[in-house]
């Protein structure tokens, strides 16, 4: 999607570097003595992933090969002095992908989604906070049973990505999803 967008704009198309955000509760990595079920607050892990293929199967293989659900990167980048300084030399990703998982909504009569839930959520990043990514794409699967949909929220910096840029990226996103399911 990103490479195609860059290509359409006549820009160089190096393999894109994404920041992937996961839930950060990698309980399976710890022995049975550790219980994080009563931990308060949101835990997340963010790690970079360079995607040099357009084949969804190869992307899946890349993701499953990442050890420790990605939490290792944060430990190496921020907690160890010897690796933190080396990793800090590299440019970070411009695009964040955050899959929030599945949420049951509606019932057996079909999908029901209260679109009013998102009316107060701005597509712009929080104005009082520092912004790490030019574009953040949050995705979740909503529904139950056979009535499930993928819902996304796109948050971008308008000084960097225009509405037409976002619209073009959303079209390419939709086309990529259609290729995957057909």
Predicted region positions:
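His-Asp-centered acyl/peptidyl-transfer active-site segments
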Residues: 7-124, 158
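Active-site catalytic microenvironments for nucleophilic, acid-base chemistry
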Residues: 1-8, 50, 176-179
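Short strand-loop-helix active-site module centered on a catalytic nucleophile
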Residues: 1-2, 70, 166
């Amino acid at each position: 999607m990103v490479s195609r967008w860059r290509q359409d704009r006549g820009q160089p198309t190096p393999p894109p570097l994404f920041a992937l955000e996961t839930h950060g509760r990698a309980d399976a990595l710890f022995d049975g003595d550790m219980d994080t079920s009563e931990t308060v607050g949101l835990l997340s892990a963010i790690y970079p992933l360079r995607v040099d293929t357009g084949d969804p199967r190869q992307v899946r293989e890349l993701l499953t090969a990442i050890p420790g659900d990605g939490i290792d990167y944060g430990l190496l980048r921020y907690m160890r002095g010897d690796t933190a300084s080396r990793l800090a030399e590299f440019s970070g990703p411009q695009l964040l992908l955050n899959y929030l998982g599945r949420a049951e909504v509606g019932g057996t009569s079909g999908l029901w989604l209260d679109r009013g839930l998102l009316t107060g959520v701005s597509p712009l990043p929080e104005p009082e906070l520092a912004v790490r990514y030019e574009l953040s794409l949050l995705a979740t699967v909503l529904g139950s049973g056979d009535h499930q949909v993928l819902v996304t929220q796109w948050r971008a910096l308008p000084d960097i990505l225009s509405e037409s840029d976002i619209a073009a990226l959303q079209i390419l996103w939709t086309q990529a999803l259609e290729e995957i399911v057909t």
